[in-house]
Regions:
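Intrinsically disordered, low-complexity terminal regions
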Residues: 1-289
Length: 289
């Protein structure tokens, strides 16, 4: 009798043709897998996977800081300050290194380890600050500073390191910008009672300001394009200055005792320009009715 159990079912013997067929089939499957893997590698090469955290902070923390009036930086940081009704502080980190952020006697202090930047030296720490008013913003490291909003009192910005300073729209009683380092400024809209710029380092920038008074003093090296509307503009140069100033004001006073190239345009009711230094002054477009 023939066995009827499935486990004892007779198997067909493997002939030479069957073995050859299986070998060719295995080879075809292997080849297909290799080609698919190669295609996958090529796709990854052409479209690399985004790095972890691309476009998003790797670390975010909201700090419960209240009552502060200043910021002091000795690290590598991007500070975004908005004058508003409430206090709010958020730290965002995009690198593996962590900055140290503390509140010390009413001042937010920021310090970074030696490896606090990325391979290109860009800021990897962002500090977003909202407060009714800040009195001081001090930089002794590397800072990208953006300011906006409406605050009372005086905001003093002091730079002793490297700073990129931007203002989109800021209102205050008085703003003091004092530079003893290297600063690049882009002030597109500033509305204050008094605006003071004192440069003892290297300054390169553009600014648009509406104020009762504008005081610009250069004791270092500066290249500045400015548009001023208000009451009285005073310019003093004791260093090396290249200034282009467009005014719509009552009084314009300029004095040079250094090396300067000054261009004045617009309108001013009272004008006085003098000095004992080496200067090239262009007033052809001033009060040119």
């Amino acid at each position: 009798m023939f066995p009827t159990s499935a486990s004892n079912t007779l198997r067909q013997p493997r002939t030479a043709c069957t073995h050859k067929y299986l070998t060719m089939k295995s080879f075809a499957i292997l080849t297909s897998l290799m080609l698919a893997h190669a295609a996958s590698l090529a796709a990854q090469a052409n479209h690399p996977a985004p790095a972890a955290g691309d476009g998003k902070p790797a670390y975010i923390e909201t700090l419960n800081y209240k009552g502060f009036t200043g910021v002091h930086n000795s690290g590598n940081v991007d500070v975004i300050y908005t004058a508003g009704k409430e206090y709010s502080v958020t730290v965002e980190e995009r690198g593996t290194a962590r900055s140290t952020v503390r509140l010390e006697e009413g001042t937010i202090t920021v310090s970074s380890p030696a490896s606090g930047g990325d391979a290109e030296g860009k800021c990897v720490t962002t500090l977003r600050i909202t407060a009714p008013a800040l009195e001081t913003l001090e930089n002794y490291g590397n800072m990208q500073l953006t300011c906006g909003g409406n605050q009372s009192g005086t905001l003093a910005i002091e730079n002793y390191g490297n700073m990129s300073f931007a203002v989109d729209s800021l209102s205050a009683d008085r703003v003091l910008l004092e530079n003893s380092g290297n600063i690049k400024a882009d002030v597109s809209k500033l509305h204050v009672r008094g605006f003071v710029v004192e440069n003892n380092g290297m300054l390169d920038g553009r600014l648009t300001a509406e104020a009762q008074t504008l005081d610009f003093e250069n004791n270092g090296t500066s290249t500045l394009e400015a548009d001023y509307k208000g009451g009285k503009a005073t310019v003093r140069n004791c260093g090396d200055s290249k200034l282009s100033l467009r005014v719509d004001c009552e009084t314009l006073n300029a004095n040079n005792s250094g090396l300067s190239e000054m261009t004045f345009s617009g309108t001013a009711d009272n004008v006085r320009i003098d000095g004992a230094g080496r200067s090239k002054v262009n007033v052809s477009q001033l009060n040119n009715f």
